[in-house]
């Protein structure tokens, strides 16, 4: 059994890791941490875990944690992760980090969007953990940077088109809508019920969202040249889910049927990417609670644009599920272990 620690277990991504790994036949959770809730039973913080976990949340002490775990998930805010990840690596532990701290390759880019990086050499060593694009590198990595939720939905939606150079990269527009859990579990006025319910708003408008450099970094690698995109996220009054609608101008004549054939071939054999039939488009309700990314496609012949729609659960394929998928790859387990749950519907 692989002994696993979850550092930062009292947030939404932490409890989703616990839920998913409870059904994993090769994993034993040996340690969970939370600075705010140390000393409390995890089932007290999350009643959904009653009678399934007897763990008590601990303070973050890397050496003590490493003594009891072979593998570490860090589900901490940015900056907090980079303070502890190097210690775990020095102690010989493999890590999947769910924060933004190791996703960007360029330390100057990280500083521009966040703050100065404390260990920039690790940016070059970490592997961006999108399994459908980086499976072989993930398998041999000691540190995997789990992708962000918006980037996962946009990158998977665009990868085949950019790889085959079927769209003009300069024309990409991504319009994404997310449930409120994407903002995390800490109290914020903007996320209160009365602020969110019956409303629908854009934020991070005008190229201000921190996921933009991550999206552009990975799309540029696919395109083989540097690109910039127009990306606008929106907050919708639902618990979870991301729906991204992506627009681009094709480089030549292409039909919806041809696009579907391309996407089916590109993602053939991928357990968690589902390409929908022509004329069918994703809904967040069809991936809720699952590790699937559903993708639908169309060509708008009137405007001459390609339209791609992708849907994921921001807490699963956009966070904890993808982290478990990466852990499976890193440890030679079947990729779908612990991730076979179907979507919750209705």
Swiss-Prot record:
Top-rank taxon: Bacteria
Active site: 149
EC number(s) per entry: 1.2.1.38
UniProt KW keywords: Amino-acid biosynthesis, Arginine biosynthesis, Cytoplasm, NADP, Oxidoreductase
GO CC entries: cytoplasm
Enzymatic reactions: N-acetyl-L-glutamate 5-semialdehyde + phosphate + NADP(+) = N-acetyl-L-glutamyl 5-phosphate + NADPH + H(+)
SMART domains linked to this entry: Semialdhyde_dh
Any Gene Ontology biological process: L-arginine biosynthetic process
Entry keyword Oxidoreductase: yes
Chief subcellular location: cytoplasm
UniProt protein name: N-acetyl-gamma-glutamyl-phosphate reductase
Organism encoding this protein: Geotalea uraniireducens (strain Rf4)
Gene assigned in the entry: argC
